[in-house]
Amino acid sequence: MIYIPKKIRYRKHHRGRLKGVASKGNNLFFASCGLQALESSWITSQQMEAARRACTRKVKRHGKLFMRFFPDKPVTYRSAETRMGSGKGTPRDWVAVIKPGKILYELKGIPEPLARKALKLASAKLPLKTKFIFKKE
């Protein structure tokens, strides 16, 4: 499943810079354990889905997985060997801009050792360093 916004205001965005830390979405909200980003990066919708699948396969569809980010930024590409000029390329991918401290995934209703293994599998599919965080209740 590819994640794409239903409606967007502008078809093409500036690329922007990855700086600063996450001010929102940096605390566990839905569950007691989660995966937190340690560096900034773009995560594509394909990477999101691969990580989600790896995690749900490990826990055998028990518990509940919460994804705390969504790819809402279009990334454009020019075809290879194209001359300079003639406008910006067409949007091809959708990415989520991730900053350090952002909670990516949360797992609920699963024992901590199994959740740790599942989220480690998910982190292997992502292009950034992450850490497992656990909230004692």
From Swiss-Prot:
Database matches in InterPro entries: Ribosomal_uL16, Ribosomal_uL16_bact-type, Ribosomal_uL16_CS, Ribosomal_uL16_dom, Ribosomal_uL16_sf
Entry keywords, A to Z: Plastid, Ribonucleoprotein, Ribosomal protein
GO molecular-function term, one example from the UniProt record: rRNA binding
Protein's UniProt keywords contain Coiled coil: no
Protein localization: Plastid
Main localisation: plastid
Family matches, as Pfam families: Ribosomal_L16
Gene Ontology cellular component annotations, sorted alphabetically: mitochondrial large ribosomal subunit; plastid
One BP annotation, GO: mitochondrial translation
Family label: Belongs to the universal ribosomal protein uL16 family.
Subunit structure: Part of the 50S ribosomal subunit.
HAMAP family xref list: Ribosomal_uL16 (MF_01342)
Name of the protein in question: Large ribosomal subunit protein uL16c
Lineage: Eukaryota, Viridiplantae, Chlorophyta, core chlorophytes, Trebouxiophyceae
